[in-house]
Amino acid sequence: MKSDQFHRLVGLIYEASADEACWPEVTKAWGHLFNDAVVALDYGATTEGAEVPLLSTHDFDVAARDLHFEEYRTPTDNPGIAALLKAPINAPVSIDSFLSQRDFDKDPSVLAILKPQGIDKGLLTTLKRDPVAFSFISIFRRRSQSDFDSQERHAQQILSRHLSK
């Protein structure tokens, strides 16, 4: 992880908070910082799962998510949403901490949205949560990529704090 990329991303986060047109640049830089990770930033999702407005992505198949949105929009239907609603704010949660590999390979939401993209690992981070809405960022890696290491998890936590301001 390069220090200059990290500091550039922090600056981009604050630029995007003033100009929404910068969010695609933020998610692209986020993906590059984490060795070409797939990034999905959702802002203002309702806790009932009624709506999950996607703010910005990098290399994430939004069409697959939208196609299966109704089926996997609630914590009952999507273990990732359940984990995000329980996780501490700004604390990255690894997919393998709430789903065994066996369960991951069988989960309908994973099979519909993540597996077709070759995604098999990820860090999910809740940015904000209140009784009606929450925001989160997910960074994923594909089968051919390594898992997230402790330095990357720490960087994700620091960056998410900037993002949640």
Predicted regions span which residues?
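Regulatory input/activation interfaces that engage signals or partners
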Residues: 4-151, 155-162
